[in-house]
Amino acid sequence: MPLLCALLRSRLQPSLLRSLTLTSAQSLSCGGSRGVRTWSARTGPGACADPAVSVSKRARAEDDASLRFVRLSEHATAPTRGSARAAGYDLYSAYDYTIPSMEKALVKTDIQIAVPSGCYGRVAPRSGLAVKHFIDVGAGVIDEDYRGNVGVVLFNFGKEKFEVKKGDRIAQLICERILYPDLEEVQTLDNTERGSGGFGSTGKN
């Protein structure tokens, strides 16, 4: 009997040690005893959840990534994207406009938006309008806290008047990350290699 017990111990000890080593490694990789092993759609089963980030905080962060909008009238058209990876959402005119040559117009979309937290909305031209009709966009910044009717300033640099019809795509809205730095007045600034050179100082072309 003592010989049988010794043989059993010699066979069980290596597997037991491997099990204990694996358990310790998992515990360390998950941040000790506070680590939580869970299923994640991104990392797969057994991923370690950060105990410092609650489920509600993660949900709020995901909600903040949405571009929310409200239709202010029955004339409004919901923004759309041309493809899944398109940089901007197309904006649509809510009314008919006529823009004379070398003139501008404020085109209403009749939508109200809330850009994601930490972003601003940049209203950019549509390449098709620029190439075919010499239409450009101005004053294209939508602040994070703006809640008014989104209007697009269109400039007609063409020789002919430009007709905007209700439901036409007039511009694209791009959400860009932004910093909100504090303003600090100082006596001097650090010197740089470029210095005060500007307006073509870096080259002829």
From Swiss-Prot:
It is an enzyme of class 3 (hydrolase). Its EC number is 3.6.1.23. The modification Phosphoserine is found at S54. Substrate binds at R126, S127, G128, G140, V141, I142, D143, G151, F199, G200. Catalyzes the cleavage of 2'-deoxyuridine 5'-triphosphate (dUTP) into 2'-deoxyuridine 5'-monophosphate (dUMP) and inorganic pyrophosphate and through its action efficiently prevents uracil misincorporation into DNA and at the same time provides dUMP, the substrate for de novo thymidylate biosynthesis. Inhibits peroxisome proliferator-activated receptor (PPAR) activity by binding of its N-terminal to PPAR, preventing the latter's dimerization with retinoid X receptor. Essential for embryonic development. NCBIfam families: dut, PRK00601.1. This is Deoxyuridine 5'-triphosphate nucleotidohydrolase.
